[in-house]
Amino acid sequence: MRIAIYPGTFDPVTNGHLDILKRATEFFDEVIVAVAVDSNKTTLFSLEERIQLLETAAEELSQVKIRGFEGLTVEFARQCGANAIIRGLRAMQDFEYEFQLALMNKKLAADIETIFLMTQSEFSFISSSSIKWAASLKGNISEFVPPHVERAIYRKYHPEIDD
C-alpha cells in the first residue's frame, strides 16, 4: 500500500490545499493530512477546529485521513507507515524553502521521499495568511476557501455578523 502524508498547519485549509490533496490521491492509496501543532506559530483555529474543517472539506475523498501531530514530520511519516511527504508549491520562493526542508528530511529519513506538486495557476497566489488578512477586513474570500471554512473564519473575526 502506497501511503503519503501531506503536512501543514492548514490555518485555515484553502482551495489550494484541497487541490493538492485531491491530486495526491491519484498517486497514493492513502493520504494522511498531517495537521501540525507548531509552538512557534499562533493559529486562528485550534488543532481540533483545523482537523474538523479539513474532515468536512475532504469528506468525499475516501482515501484521505486527517490526523494531528507534533514533532518531526519524518517521524510522523514513519509512525503512519508513509514513504512519501507531499508538498505543494505555489512559486519559486516556495521552492527555495521547501527544497531546504526536503534536504533536511532526506538526511533525517533517507527512506522517505518528498514529492512536490505544483498548484494550479488559479491557486498560485492563495495563502492562509492572505485569506485571514482579507477576512479580518471583511473582504470576500468565498473563491479561496470552501463555504464552511469561510463561515468559520468570519465567526472568528466578526462574531457580530450572522451566517
From Swiss-Prot:
Site feature (Transition state stabilizer) residues: 17
MF terms in GO: ATP binding; pantetheine-phosphate adenylyltransferase activity
Gene Ontology CC annotations of this record: cytoplasm
Nucleus recorded as keyword: no
Amino acids binding substrate: 9, 41, 73, 87
Stored SUPFAM superfamilies: Nucleotidylyl transferase
Keywords from the UniProt entry: ATP-binding, Coenzyme A biosynthesis, Cytoplasm, Magnesium, Nucleotide-binding, Nucleotidyltransferase, Transferase
Gene Ontology BP terms: coenzyme A biosynthetic process
Pathway(s) the chain acts in: Cofactor biosynthesis; coenzyme A biosynthesis; CoA from (R)-pantothenate: step 4/5
UniProt catalytic activity: (R)-4'-phosphopantetheine + ATP + H(+) = 3'-dephospho-CoA + diphosphate
Main localization (coarse): cytoplasm
Enzyme class of the recorded protein, top EC level: transferase
Subcellular location: Cytoplasm
Names of required cofactors: Mg(2+)
Highest taxon listed in the record's lineage: Bacteria
Binding positions (ATP): 9-10, 17, 88-90, 98, 123-129
Record-listed E.C. numbers: 2.7.7.3
PANTHER family noted in UniProt: PHOSPHOPANTETHEINE ADENYLYLTRANSFERASE
Subunit structure: Homohexamer.
Family (UniProt): Belongs to the bacterial CoaD family.
Described purpose of this protein according to its UniProt entry: Reversibly transfers an adenylyl group from ATP to 4'-phosphopantetheine, yielding dephospho-CoA (dPCoA) and pyrophosphate.
Matches recorded under NCBIfam families: coaD_prev_kdtB (TIGR01510), cyt_tran_rel (TIGR00125)
Protein name (record): Phosphopantetheine adenylyltransferase
Source organism (scientific name): Desulfitobacterium hafniense (strain DSM 10664 / DCB-2)
